[in-house]
Amino acid sequence: MRNDKRLPDAELEVMQTIWSLGTQATAAEVQQHADKDWKMTSVLTFLSRLCDKGFLSCTKEGRQNLYTPLVSEEDYRQRESVGFLRRLCGGSVKNLVASLSDAGALTDRDIDELRAFLDRQTH
């Protein structure tokens, strides 16, 4: 499913928790495995919003709901990366890398990994 909505941080954390749990999760599992100390009412609100936005489906399984991702983690990451690049750097990867370098955010190891990655892409 193609979903162009950008998620707020809390909803993204819920999605990351579900993605890390596998193919589906209950609200209790999300609450237990999330890195936040959320109340169940907050978790249920986030899950409901994610269903409304088309990121999750909800099916009744006995007495509980099972939430299944409709958007993969990789698809979301790729879309957000491209959007970030367009919004902040005018679509220029060079500008992004230059900004990171100027800010001192790139280590020698990062640069070596980038070179190796680019070498693999061109060969």
Located regions from the model:
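Amphipathic alpha-helical dimerization/coiled-coil segments
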Residues: 80-123
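Pre-recognition alpha-helix immediately N-terminal to the DNA-recognition helix
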Residues: 12-17, 29, 95
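Short, cationic-aromatic polyanion-contact patches
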Residues: 4-10, 61-80
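Short, hydrophobic-biased segments on the C-terminal half of alpha helices
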Residues: 44-48
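Short helix-capping/hinge SLiMs at alpha-helix to coil transitions
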Residues: 18-23, 103
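Short acidic, hydrophobic short linear motifs in intrinsically disordered regions
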Residues: 24-34
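Glycine-centered, phosphate/nucleic-acid-interacting loop/turn motifs that mediate DNA/RNA or nucleotide
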Residues: 54
